[in-house]
Amino acid sequence: MKRLLALALSLMIVLLAIPALSEGRQRPEDKKIIETDDVVGAHTVFKKYDNKFYDEPSEQPGTVVRLDYRTAAYGDELDSYVNVYLPYGYDENGAERYNIIYFLPGTNEVQDSFIGDEKAKNALDNMIEVGVADPFIMVFPCYYYDYENRLINMEAFSEKEMRDDIMPLVESTFRTYAETTDDAGFIASRDHRAFAGFSRGCYACWHQFFHSLDRAKYFMPFSANISGAEEMSLDMPVEEQIQMIKDALDAQADYRNDFFIYAACGGKRDMMYDVNAALISAMIQDTDDFSFGTDSSVNNLYYAISGELHQTLMSRFYLYNAFDVVFR
């Protein structure tokens, strides 16, 4: 009798455990929440996730593949490549379609710099596994057309290499929401596409905003201001930066009321803190073109301040926060 009771009890414990196991790992509480009210004239929130969870390997790891291509965006044909992050369970023969993010790295960095760091890769895996974000594809190009000499032509990169070479290659190879990779296909799927960038990559992200509102709804510029001819210039007047945004909106009038910018920056230890906050503050005050908040159905601008250093790896935290809005 005792054996039967013990067996029954063991079976009950196993059965009770099955639902818990099927649910998988649970999203942990955030490690820290930073709120500010007096930096840009609006209430901002930054959530720092639990590093011990998100930076460790996920039970559902995605994969990173390389795509090679040639570009004539700068005159002579050049060889280049992008890294592409594919979420766990991606099936090249399947039917599911995925949101896509193009991420541009910082100064002196390349296609491998962010996704090649295991903390960044693990963070993306874990965010998808526990439901912070729906499964997505993430692409890592490089805007240096001659990396050895650190040569950049941001206009050619934004208008030609990204639009004519990288996007058609990636989205004809992998299953995004673009059913075709011509202008019509990209326009029809723009709600499922985002550009992001850190530091000089933030500058590159702004240039995508200037040229590709027809192809993406979401933009995530992290830790920099807007620059003109002098790349990464810290002294361009805020008024000129705002005018560059307004000119871009005028030139892409069909999308003037259909975009969302999720900006973020470090704290006072971040060398871009002052210029970045000044730009966002001016944008918030410009209520003709911007509405601050996290409801993407009525707002088009939000800002998070981490209090951290100027490091591209911080982008994993900024993405974590941005996923409260982006693709929602």
Explain the meaning of each model-derived region.
Residues 1-8:
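Positively charged n-region of N-terminal signal peptides that target proteins for export
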Residues 9, 13-16:
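Hydrophobic core
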Residues 18-21:
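Sec/Tat signal peptide C-region and signal peptidase I cleavage site
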Residues 23-328:
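Non-catalytic cap/lid and distal C-terminal segments of serine-dependent acyl enzymes
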